């Protein structure tokens, strides 16, 4: 049943609920300050009719009218949208704990993912435990440094694939190639095995599967807007989402089952990868880690860790092809620092490649991995930037709006890596005009790995090859349109022809 058909069925019931609801007693704070300004909501549906297909742009435009913090109604849900660096700074520095909980979409609740996911759990002892495992076993400097050779090997495989395409004069689907590299890097880190190859359709199928999950979670849903009507959840949450999640879980379950069987046989476990570590922790006496925790942890990292990296790399290559003078500057720096004959870029080289780093950062500014940070929920009434954020309101931080705010960025619509050379801008949650991976206690734990991989892959692609568009297309013909989900991908995949230097 489609979205509007469902709405027509439940509208009379919602109308009745609207008049039967009782207002909660007002707190002292609610009697002294008001909600942020915003467009007048309609009865029942609120401001849902105004969102459109690109809600990040809609909310950014509304911020130009009503200010950097606005209030809306998504059905019955009070929603606060933060659209400036100043408001984000106050939010994360002053109210991070009060806004640390998540507003969990119905799509995430569909298979109970919110009960196990480090991305969606509230800040509880369980969340801290899972976060600690992620920080120590995956993303600590020691662990990242120990796996440099693995990342290098995966980039070399990417290089070999593109060389073969170059020799054949065939174009490369940049996003799909980057996705395969990211997927195999993660699968080798966790499982000591590849999950896809550049020559098979498996990578594209896995990429489509991950995108479907991200798309379903990111799009509006009636169950999120009218939580009092519980049966809508079963009607309006796309049932296909359960199928997508189950397909991923089947892959993980088979790998785990084989690993557990090997541990009980004469072969032993002995891979020394992340899965071995997680299973060992699970088997300890009084362990807090369960098999369900491991399955959902894998779901988190294999969706977020593959899609965001590959999408960002695709946008970086798109921007460089669209701005050939920037491509030339990045290539000149690589040649100067590494030399013409050096093919393999090491992670230790990245610190010397300032323009390359600036290019990655500018891509993250213009095309943030998520246009909205995952939604927060107010655990109490708070005063944010002189306005009331009421208890249980959901709060969206519009990274896209912040990234294109002219009060923070000069000429924000221009792709200009130079802006990151002129000033020292940190992306670890301290410079609030540039928080592509979030800020505060819920900042993305994988940001350091993502940043290393983006520089390594992009540097390799443009140092070893020149690139051109196929079919006689010029840079003016490049399609820069995006499509909305939790991540923003190119609406039309980038296909470019590599030319070996």
From Swiss-Prot:
Cytochrome P450 monooxygenase participating in the biosynthesis of natural products derived from phenylethylamine, including mescaline, a natural hallucinogen potentially used in psychotherapeutic treatments. Catalyzes the hydroxylation of tyramine to dopamine and of 3-methoxytyramine to 3,4-dihydroxy-5-methoxyphenethylamine. Glycans are attached at residues 115, 264. The gene is CYP76AD131. Belongs to the cytochrome P450 family. The keyword DNA damage does not apply. It catalyses: tyramine + reduced [NADPH--hemoprotein reductase] + O2 = dopamine + oxidized [NADPH--hemoprotein reductase] + H2O + H(+); 3-methoxytyramine + reduced [NADPH--hemoprotein reductase] + O2 = 3,4-dihydroxy-5-methoxyphenethylamine + oxidized [NADPH--hemoprotein reductase] + H2O + H(+). This is Cytochrome P450 monooxygenase 76AD131. Keywords: Alkaloid metabolism, Glycoprotein, Iron, Membrane, Metal-binding, Oxidoreductase, Transmembrane, Transmembrane helix. The keyword Repeat does not apply. It is found in: Membrane.
């Amino acid at each position: 049943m489609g979205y509007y058909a469902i709405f027509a069925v439940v509208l009379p019931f919602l109308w009745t609920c609207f008049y039967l609801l009782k207002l909660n007693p007002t707190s002292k704070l609610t009697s002294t300050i008001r909600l942020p300004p915003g467009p007048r909501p309609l009865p029942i549906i609120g401001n849902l009719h105004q969102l459109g297909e690109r809600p990040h742009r809609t909310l950014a435009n509304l911020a130009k009218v009503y200010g950097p913090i606005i209030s809306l109604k998504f059905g019955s849900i009070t929603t606060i949208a933060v659209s400036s660096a100043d408001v984000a700074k106050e939010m994360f520095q002053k109210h991070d704990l009060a806004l640390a909980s998540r507003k969990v979409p119905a799509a995430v609740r569909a298979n109970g993912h919110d009960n196990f996911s480090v991305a969606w759990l509230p800040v509880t002892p369980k969340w801290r435990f899972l976060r600690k495992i992620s920080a120590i076993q995956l993303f600590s400097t020691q662990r990242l440094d120990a796996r440099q050779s693995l990342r290098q090997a995966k980039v070399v495989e990417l290089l070999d694939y593109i060389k073969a395409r170059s020799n054949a004069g065939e174009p490369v689907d940049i996003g799909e190639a980057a996705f395969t590299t990211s997927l195999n890097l993660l699968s080798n880190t966790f499982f000591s095995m590849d999950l896809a190859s550049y020559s098979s359709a498996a990578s594209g199928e896995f990429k489509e599967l991950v995108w479907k999950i991200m798309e379903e979670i990111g799009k509006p849903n009636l169950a999120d807007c009218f939580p009092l009507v519980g049966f809508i959840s079963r009607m309006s949450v796309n049932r296909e989402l359960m199928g997508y999640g189950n397909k991923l879980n089947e892959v993980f379950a088979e790998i785990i089952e084989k690993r557990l069987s090997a541990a009980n046989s004469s072969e032993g476990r002995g891979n020394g990868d992340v899965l071995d570590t997680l299973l060992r922790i699970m088997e300890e006496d009084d362990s807090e880690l369960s098999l369900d925790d491991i399955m959902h942890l894998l779901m988190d990292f294999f969706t977020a860790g593959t899609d965001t990296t590959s999408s960002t790399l695709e946008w970086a290559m798109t921007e460089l092809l669209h701005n050939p003078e920037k491509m030339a500057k990045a290539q000149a720096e690589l040649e100067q620092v590494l030399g013409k004959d050096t093919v393999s870029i090491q992670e230790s080289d990245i610190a010397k490649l300032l323009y390359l780093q600036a290019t990655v950062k500018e891509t993250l500014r213009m095309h943030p991995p998520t246009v909205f940070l995952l939604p927060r929920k107010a655990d109490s009434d708070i005063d944010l930037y002189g306005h009331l954020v009421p208890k249980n309101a959901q709060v969206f931080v519009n990274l896209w709006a912040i990234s294109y705010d002219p009060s923070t960025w000069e000429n924000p619509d221009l792709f200009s890596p130079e802006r990151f050379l002129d000033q020292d801008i940190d992306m670890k949650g301290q410079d609030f005009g540039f928080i592509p991976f979030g800020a505060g206690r819920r900042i993305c734990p994988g940001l350091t790995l993502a940043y290393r991989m983006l520089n390594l892959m992009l540097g390799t692609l443009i140092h070893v090859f020149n690139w051109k568009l196929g079919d006689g297309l010029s840079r003016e013909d490049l399609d820069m349109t995006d499509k909305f989900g939790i991540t923003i991908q190119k609406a039309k995949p980038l296909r470019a022809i590599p030319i070996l230097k």
